[in-house]
Each structure stands twice: as C-alpha cells, then as structure tokens.
Amino acid sequence: INVSDSKGKATGSSIAVIEGKNSIELNNCDLTGYAIGRGTGGVDDAGVMVYQSMSGDADNGVGTFSASDSKLTIDPASGKYSTAPMFFVTNTEGVINLTNTELSFGSGKLLNVAGNNGEWGTKGANGADLTFNADNQNLEGLITVDKISTLKLNLKSSTLKSTVNSANSGKEVDISLDKNSTWNVTGTSYVTVLTDEDTSLDNIKDNGNTIYYDSSNSSNSWLEGKTITLNDGGVLTPAE
C-alpha cells in the first residue's frame, strides 16, 4: 500500500496495521488513529502495529512500515491515549523506516517489541525481530524489548530522547548513531551493541545516567571493555 498527500482519521482502530509479508509506505500524509486493537487484554492497542497472525491469510516474511514527511497521531480523545505505544511489533520480522515524520502520542511509550499472550504464534516463541531506521527524525519515548525479541535501531541525522531496554530484558538490542545523531538518555539503558561514528561519544547526552553494553560482543571491541565517563557524569560501562 502506497499513500501520498492524504489526511485521515480512524476512530475505531490503529493508524496502520501490517500483517505478514506486506508493506505500507506513506509520503506527506497526516493520519490519526485511536490505537484500538482487537486482541484480548488490549495487547495490540498501538498507533502502528506490525505482526503475523498465523491465520494463513498473509504470507510469512518481513512487514515494512515507512513514513516520510508525514504526521502520525494517537488522538487525545481516545481511551488508549495515555497507555498505547506508538509502535508495537510482535510475532514477525519487521522494518520501520521514518524520515522527517512527526509522532504525537500520550503514553510516553515510543516502541514495544515483544511477544504476546499466544493469540498470534506460540506464547514464549512469538517475539519479533525489528530493524528501525530513522533519518532526519526526532524520536522520543520509552523503548522496550522482551527476552524473545530483538531490535536494531539505526539513527542517521536524528535525535533520540529515550530510555532503552531499561529492564535489560531484550534478547538483543543494538543502537547505531552516525556523527550527526544524538541520543539524549533519560534513564538507565542496556544495549547489546553500541556503534557510534562519533567515537568521542559527545553525541550521547547522558544526563547522569548509565548505559550498559555487552563487552563480550566483538562489535563493541572499540570500547575495549572500559567504563567510560560521559560528559554529564553518567557512564558507559560493561554489563555484569
């Protein structure tokens, strides 16, 4: 599905839902949803959801959501406004591409990559593997990843204001920043791999918080297993 130069509101659903090996691409759109899903217990209440239902009506594969020069809003009038994440990915492999797109939501939860209660896939084996690419993009909000899910977050000329994987629950959580990107750290965060074109780490605004990384992962060899004091008194340090 490709949509350009459009404005719309859905008062009984999410902004967009992708099932299986399908894609949605938005350009210069202004879309609003109520973040209302159909799963039990509200597990799929989200602004945008990428998933695989296993019902047979969509091929297995990568689900891709892309938006450029657009605005995505969870309506403040929705009963889900204060609780629903902007993005939820479950039981699938997914890609989210955002370029110069405004996100408006009230929960403080940017992204949840996680399994579900068994409605889609087998509970305990229905996590997600997500690649999230941000280009000229402002991102703000909590990022959570559960023990059966992975996230690769790539920032290009973008800003991230977030606590990432605060429970240290993610199976793998990788963050990559180019030299023109900034991570404003709002709380203790755990990453598997940290890649930064700015090897001085000056583009990480730590606010006194701690970032833990996996010193046994060869992709972190440039950090030499060290504890590094960041500019605002926080540290980047190996996880125990």
Can you say where each PLM-predicted feature lies in the sequence?
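Surface-exposed loop/turn motifs in large extracellular/passenger domains
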Residues: 1-12, 17-38, 43-79, 87-106, ...
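Extracellular, surface-exposed repeat/solenoid domains
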Residues: 174-178, 182-239
